[in-house]
């Protein structure tokens, strides 16, 4: 999404993460599902496969995953995925921002985000509002849903008027 700033790409990454990548590995970690159980008559997890490409790609994806949580451009920060985490982002000379996310997502939809700039700084913070929470299961029309979640956003315990553009709610303000 760094090329376009559109949240639909992170929606798809999140869908793959929770519905495919993480579910393909057995709890013991030594078996992997190679076929889509929704599209196969019989499915099982294998300990070894003649072409073992999926397990190494899973490890590669797992290693790359933290890099998808946050992104930024020269003006502001994107919160792409909801994961308990901490990071530091340099927006420009003297604009170092510390971010901390606390959440039990996907089991609980509440996310607490702490924004701590080294000094008071104005910048837009763009928080992805997942398509599924807006009733958009898939931006390509592959899935449909009537489900919508109530979306609430607060800054310092004060409600924020949600303006969603390209899948992100933007809060442009001076952060302290």
For each feature predicted by the language model, list its residue ranges.
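Aromatic (Trp/Tyr) and acidic
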Residues: 1-141, 164, 170
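Solvent-exposed beta-strand/loop surfaces of large extracellular or lumenal domains
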Residues: 135-173
């Amino acid at each position: 999404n760094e090329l376009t700033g559109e949240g639909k790409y992170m929606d798809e990454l999140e869908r793959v993460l929770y519905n495919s990548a993480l579910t393909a590995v057995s709890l013991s970690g030594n078996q992997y599902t190679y076929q889509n159980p929704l599209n196969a008559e019989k499915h099982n997890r294998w300990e070894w496969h003649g072409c073992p490409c999926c397990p190494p790609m899973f490890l590669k994806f797992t290693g790359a995953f933290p890099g998808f949580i946050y992104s930024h451009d020269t003006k502001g920060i994107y919160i792409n995925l909801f994961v308990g985490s901490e990071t530091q982002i340099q927006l420009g000379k003297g604009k170092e921002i510390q971010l901390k996310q606390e959440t039990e997502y996907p089991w609980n939809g509440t996310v607490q985000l702490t924004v701590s700039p080294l000094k008071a700084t104005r910048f837009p913070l763009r928080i992805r509002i997942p398509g599924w929470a807006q009733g958009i299961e898939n931006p390509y029309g592959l899935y449909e849903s009537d489900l919508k979640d109530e979306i609430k956003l607060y800054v310092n315990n004060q409600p924020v008027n949600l303006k969603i553009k390209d899948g992100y709610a933007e809060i442009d303000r001076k952060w302290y």
